[in-house]
């Protein structure tokens, strides 16, 4: 080798060594928000039914969740009639967000507040409230990220035609979504059509432990009717078509003028095999297809996953060629809500005469929301899965959080350092995923405030900010995690000696 060539190789070797050392040093140093790409959004979230209160004020009418609660189906007997009462405290709440340094606030619009009967007249008081909230956020430099539907279907539509189980839902939802675009889209630039449409069909129409309480034996009991083997798939199909319809309206009539983006938010749990058996490994892959691919596969490829087609058969609705064209690509981003891993085992579906979603998937596993474990590596697996299987779509992490122990029910609790540790682990895992090519563009903590939690009432509290539910004024207070997150948002370091990314 000539002297010049040797010198060139030596120089290149030194450069490579420095780059590698820099990468190692970067992993060992403290992480700050400035290590994320420019424009990366950090925020926190809520939903209308859970945080607003004012359940019977200013023209709002009941949702299916109001009915569910009033009929006595909440295990702890609680309700969301007042909850954190953001309806009356939104200015105070936005000031808290501003003081903490949030880039964005994710919230939902209550369909029964904006259009109380589900269709027809707009409630002027509802319109006023959301305009005021959006304006207050923008005045404080906080982006509004709006979910159009977060489980709170107007009871009027459930009574009239069975709600989401009927294809009539698609037209009514589309009209409601257009009201939102028309009235708020000049200021709202980030829309999600649905929150967790891959969960509502299971709870409401398979297990029947959520409204409208439809199920069939042996998959649920004490239901109002239903068929657990077919209705979850029908409902999911209607949600998918309603999503595509709303996106089509937005793109054809509003997007070019308003300059916003629209997507959908899915629950994305990660499934791992319970044992090292080949059957359990296959079950985990299959369950990720049933859970994530149920919506993402048609959104990206235009049809349901092949494994669902083969295992569900004729009970899985067909996607017509015209519907496939509307559904495929009907997103500018994918929102994901991720909390934990479920370890699953394979079961023999052929031995089951009666079938539902989980029998069709051929898996069993434990879903323990009350005891969330920190497996932050799972977020990396989720984001890598989206990158490899679905073309690396733009992603917004719309929910990630940890609940206080039920033992502190009814108490004011500032000390939630484990929440800070939990979030730090996931932020570190998120950073590594972004560095490795994930197209993730935002992260929202669930939740901004303590509030009513679906099925759990006030026993589980996810808030960065606490709420004194014993006080009529619903006094807010900053927990330790709120101060920790605020420090990060303002450029502070996530200390490496307190790293939880491997948990």
Swiss-Prot record:
Hydrolase as UniProt keyword: yes
Chain positions carrying an annotated carbohydrate: 222, 436
Gene encoding the protein: BGLU33
Annotated Gene3D superfamilies: Glycosidases
PROSITE patterns: GLYCOSYL_HYDROL_F1_2 (PS00653)
Pfam families (UniProt xref): Glyco_hydro_1
Disulphide bridges: 215-223
Enzyme active site: 399 (nucleophile)
Record carries keyword Signal: yes
Family: Belongs to the glycosyl hydrolase 1 family.
Superkingdom assignment: Eukaryota
GO biological process: carbohydrate metabolic process
Protein name according to UniProt: Probable inactive beta-glucosidase 33
Residues reported to bind a beta-D-glucoside: 50, 150, 195-196, 339, 399, 446, 453-454, 462
GO molecular function, a single term: beta-D-fucosidase activity
Alphabetically ordered keywords of this record: Disulfide bond, Glycoprotein, Hydrolase, Signal
Organism: Oryza sativa subsp. japonica (Rice)
Signal peptide boundaries: 1-30
